[in-house]
A protein has these predicted regions:
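Non-transmembrane "mature" sequence context
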Residues: 1-146
Length: 146
Protein backbone atom coordinates (compact mmCIF):
# COMPACT_ATOMS: atom_id res chain seq x y z
CA UNK A 1 0.00 0.00 0.00
CA UNK A 2 1.28 3.44 -0.91
CA UNK A 3 1.63 5.87 1.95
CA UNK A 4 2.86 8.94 0.16
CA UNK A 5 1.90 10.94 -2.88
CA UNK A 6 4.81 10.70 -5.28
CA UNK A 7 3.67 13.24 -7.85
CA UNK A 8 1.58 16.41 -7.71
CA UNK A 9 -0.93 14.88 -10.13
CA UNK A 10 -1.53 12.05 -7.65
CA UNK A 11 -2.35 14.61 -4.95
CA UNK A 12 -4.89 16.26 -7.20
CA UNK A 13 -6.39 12.87 -8.08
CA UNK A 14 -7.08 12.29 -4.39
CA UNK A 15 -8.44 15.82 -3.99
CA UNK A 16 -10.71 15.49 -7.03
CA UNK A 17 -11.94 12.07 -5.85
CA UNK A 18 -13.72 13.84 -2.98
CA UNK A 19 -14.47 17.10 -4.80
CA UNK A 20 -18.18 16.38 -5.12
CA UNK A 21 -18.37 16.05 -1.31
CA UNK A 22 -16.46 19.20 -0.45
CA UNK A 23 -18.08 21.79 -2.71
CA UNK A 24 -19.64 23.77 0.13
CA UNK A 25 -20.41 23.39 3.82
CA UNK A 26 -23.85 21.91 3.24
CA UNK A 27 -22.60 19.26 0.81
CA UNK A 28 -19.67 18.41 3.09
CA UNK A 29 -21.93 18.11 6.14
CA UNK A 30 -24.41 15.86 4.34
CA UNK A 31 -21.59 13.63 3.06
CA UNK A 32 -20.10 13.46 6.55
CA UNK A 33 -23.44 12.50 8.10
CA UNK A 34 -23.51 9.39 5.92
CA UNK A 35 -19.94 8.48 6.87
CA UNK A 36 -17.41 7.14 4.39
CA UNK A 37 -15.44 3.91 4.26
CA UNK A 38 -11.98 3.80 5.75
CA UNK A 39 -10.48 4.28 2.29
CA UNK A 40 -10.86 7.98 3.07
CA UNK A 41 -8.39 7.52 5.93
CA UNK A 42 -5.88 5.84 3.59
CA UNK A 43 -6.32 8.59 1.01
CA UNK A 44 -5.62 11.27 3.64
CA UNK A 45 -2.43 9.43 4.65
CA UNK A 46 -1.36 9.35 1.00
CA UNK A 47 -2.26 12.98 0.42
CA UNK A 48 -0.62 14.38 3.54
CA UNK A 49 2.41 12.11 3.77
CA UNK A 50 1.88 11.87 7.52
CA UNK A 51 2.04 8.54 9.33
CA UNK A 52 -0.96 6.38 10.17
CA UNK A 53 -0.40 7.21 13.83
CA UNK A 54 -0.52 10.97 13.25
CA UNK A 55 -3.67 10.81 11.14
CA UNK A 56 -5.29 8.35 13.57
CA UNK A 57 -4.41 10.77 16.38
CA UNK A 58 -6.35 13.53 14.62
CA UNK A 59 -9.38 11.23 14.81
CA UNK A 60 -8.66 10.20 18.40
CA UNK A 61 -8.62 6.56 17.28
CA UNK A 62 -5.76 4.10 17.59
CA UNK A 63 -4.01 2.85 14.45
CA UNK A 64 -4.95 -0.68 15.47
CA UNK A 65 -8.65 0.20 15.62
CA UNK A 66 -8.45 1.80 12.18
CA UNK A 67 -6.74 -1.30 10.78
CA UNK A 68 -9.61 -3.39 12.14
CA UNK A 69 -12.10 -0.98 10.53
CA UNK A 70 -10.28 -1.36 7.21
CA UNK A 71 -10.32 -5.16 7.41
CA UNK A 72 -14.04 -5.12 8.17
CA UNK A 73 -14.81 -2.43 5.54
CA UNK A 74 -16.48 -0.32 8.22
CA UNK A 75 -17.60 3.24 7.76
CA UNK A 76 -16.03 6.13 9.66
CA UNK A 77 -18.34 8.02 11.98
CA UNK A 78 -19.66 11.43 10.84
CA UNK A 79 -17.21 13.48 12.94
CA UNK A 80 -14.18 11.57 11.59
CA UNK A 81 -15.51 11.77 8.05
CA UNK A 82 -16.07 15.52 8.35
CA UNK A 83 -12.60 16.12 9.76
CA UNK A 84 -10.87 14.09 7.03
CA UNK A 85 -12.86 15.79 4.26
CA UNK A 86 -11.90 19.18 5.73
CA UNK A 87 -8.26 18.09 5.82
CA UNK A 88 -8.47 17.23 2.11
CA UNK A 89 -9.81 20.76 1.48
CA UNK A 90 -7.06 22.18 3.68
CA UNK A 91 -4.39 20.38 1.67
CA UNK A 92 -5.92 21.58 -1.58
CA UNK A 93 -5.59 25.15 -0.31
CA UNK A 94 -2.14 24.51 1.20
CA UNK A 95 -0.82 23.14 -2.09
CA UNK A 96 -2.16 26.22 -3.87
CA UNK A 97 -0.61 28.65 -1.37
CA UNK A 98 2.75 26.92 -0.86
CA UNK A 99 3.16 25.28 -4.27
CA UNK A 100 3.93 21.77 -3.03
CA UNK A 101 3.39 19.38 -0.17
CA UNK A 102 6.92 19.63 1.20
CA UNK A 103 6.69 23.36 1.85
CA UNK A 104 3.13 23.13 3.15
CA UNK A 105 3.82 20.29 5.60
CA UNK A 106 6.95 22.08 6.78
CA UNK A 107 4.79 25.13 7.55
CA UNK A 108 2.25 22.94 9.37
CA UNK A 109 4.99 21.77 11.76
CA UNK A 110 6.24 25.23 12.78
CA UNK A 111 4.66 27.86 15.04
CA UNK A 112 2.38 30.10 12.98
CA UNK A 113 2.49 33.80 13.79
CA UNK A 114 -1.11 34.35 12.67
CA UNK A 115 -2.27 31.57 14.97
CA UNK A 116 -0.66 33.10 18.03
CA UNK A 117 2.41 30.89 17.79
CA UNK A 118 0.43 27.65 17.75
CA UNK A 119 1.86 24.82 15.64
CA UNK A 120 -0.86 24.16 13.03
CA UNK A 121 -0.54 20.37 12.98
CA UNK A 122 -1.34 20.34 16.71
CA UNK A 123 -4.81 21.82 16.18
CA UNK A 124 -5.82 19.56 13.31
CA UNK A 125 -7.63 17.26 15.77
CA UNK A 126 -10.76 19.40 15.56
CA UNK A 127 -12.87 20.75 12.75
CA UNK A 128 -12.50 24.23 14.25
CA UNK A 129 -8.72 23.87 14.26
CA UNK A 130 -8.73 22.97 10.56
CA UNK A 131 -10.93 26.03 9.94
CA UNK A 132 -8.43 28.27 11.77
CA UNK A 133 -5.57 26.89 9.67
CA UNK A 134 -7.60 27.42 6.51
CA UNK A 135 -8.28 31.03 7.51
CA UNK A 136 -4.56 31.54 8.12
CA UNK A 137 -3.77 30.14 4.67
CA UNK A 138 -6.21 32.63 3.16
CA UNK A 139 -4.41 35.47 4.97
CA UNK A 140 -1.05 34.19 3.69
CA UNK A 141 -2.47 33.85 0.17
CA UNK A 142 -3.52 37.50 0.18
CA UNK A 143 -0.39 38.78 1.91
CA UNK A 144 -2.10 39.68 5.18
CA UNK A 145 0.62 38.49 7.53
CA UNK A 146 0.05 40.99 10.35
Amino acid sequence: MKNKVSEPSEAYQIISKYGNMTGNDQVLTLAAMKGLKTGLFSDVISLTGFSRDIVAGWLDISSKTLMNYEKQSKYLNPASTELLLKIILLFEKGLKVFGDRIHFTRWLKKPAYGLGGVIPIEIMRTSGGVDLISDELTRIEYGDLA
